[in-house]
Amino acid sequence: MVLGGLFSFVRKAGTGGALGLGLLLLGSGARAQNAPPEKPQVTRILFLLDASGSMMAPWEGQPRWEVAKRMLGKMADSLNAYPNLELGLRVYGHQFPNSAKNCEDSRLEVPFAPRNAQAIKAKLTTLKAQGNTPITYALRQSAGDFPADKTARNVLLLITDGLESCNADPCAASLDLQRKRVFLKPFVIGIGAQQDFGKQLECLGQYYNAAEVKTFRTVMNDVVAQTLAKTTVAVNLTDADGRPVESNVNLTFVNNVTGQPEYNYVHYRDAQGRADVLAIDALQSYDLVINTVPAVRQANVPIRAGKANVLTFKTPQGTLFLQPPALTPNPYGAVQAVVRAAGAPATAVALPFGTRQKLLAGPYDVEVLTLPRLTRRVSVRQGQEVAVTYPAPGTLNITTDLKGYGSIYQLNNDESQTWVYNLPDGGSSKLNLPMQPGAYRLVFRTKTALGSKFTDVRNFTIRSGQTTSVGIFGR
């Protein structure tokens, strides 16, 4: 599992090996289920075993095939007594010789059942390693091996010493089946393999390099321990000083292989300020999205299987209050504002005036959708409220009714002008328009005028709460 220095891990409980202390079956589903199922959840482990011809190569004095069968048999024995656990065995490359180049040589040899270690061991004694390496075909066939059970945890463990030999893409197949929720992120054990061998299998799932027999035994134990051990996560949301005071924010655990959200939990702290403990399936890898505004996303959160993980994030928040002016009725009606992190193009949130919104502490640009638009730079501070308002508008009343083309410009202090508004193109000039206080210019030509020189220019001033009437061409 990936570990990072940004997080704190406390209350750690050891998992041990698969053959060691009793492990609890994880009670959280592969789907985004926050409530426990009514009946105990079943975990199904499908062993996908490579029986290609290369498995007969020697490995520390004995064929890889014999080592793999022996280790797999011992593991099945060690798991035989676990409740709510079913095992299955699919093999590939064992029905046809390598010379046949058969790319559909895979079969479910032992279907899922509880306490079926003897069946698995008996079947292993009858199989022969001799054929091709159709990993992709075997993966896709495994989709039909798992019973239709939406509440179960489906786990696939691939044991192989070779790469795909059938011009297919096992990585794409694995991703596709994970997205379809056939199984969780697979475990892949490369036996007797060189280091670069694993680089081509890492995309399948969690890869382990068992270059030695001793390592193979350890890896097998570790994989099963991860599968069966209970894992919990508590998330502390702190202020700028590291105090865990933030809460009531949705936490989304996103499967970073499939991109699908697996869990949504609205953060909770008890009366003592402690974050509650969440049951999270450690067989997935996650990005955590803390749905503050704007959201905080941490890629590859380091959740360790069989541990009581505590993750800590700084998410100091303050409140933005969009305060409307004291003018009733407001000629604008409902005014909206667009809030962006200072200097950022993306919108953090759009809100109507009269509302309050929690924001991460920091500087923001608030664009007020008045006419003309206003931009305010504000600083949101931890635990404080900052207000943004705008001057009460006045109203422009163009009294002349002429068809034509016109625009309104704001007059700036440096005597430049900034476009604000276009009158209806070719339509009537008569209108009532709420505007911000300030100096403006109206430029208009009638539709029937025979030249640009017949343009009328009128300067006017808008005052809060007042109506300014403007006539065109002296009318």
Give the label of every model feature segment.
Residues 33, 43-44, 52, 58-67, ...:
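Exposed acidic/Ser/Thr-rich ligand/metal-binding surfaces
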Residues 231-242, 318-327, 395-402:
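A short, amphipathic beta-strand motif
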Residues 261-279, 342-357, 382, 416-433, ...:
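Short, solvent-exposed S/T- and G/P-enriched segments that are highly enriched in secreted/extracellular
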Residues 14-26:
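Bacterial N-terminal signal peptides
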Residues 269-287, 291-295, 353-365, 369-372, ...:
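Short Pro-Gly-centered beta-turn/loop motif in secreted/extracellular proteins
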Residues 269-271, 291-316, 371-393, 447-475:
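Structured interaction patches on ligand/partner-binding surfaces of diverse proteins
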Residues 213-271:
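C-terminal "exit" segments of structured domains
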Residues 241-263, 326-346, 402-419:
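Short, ordered, surface-exposed loop/turn motifs in non-cytosolic proteins
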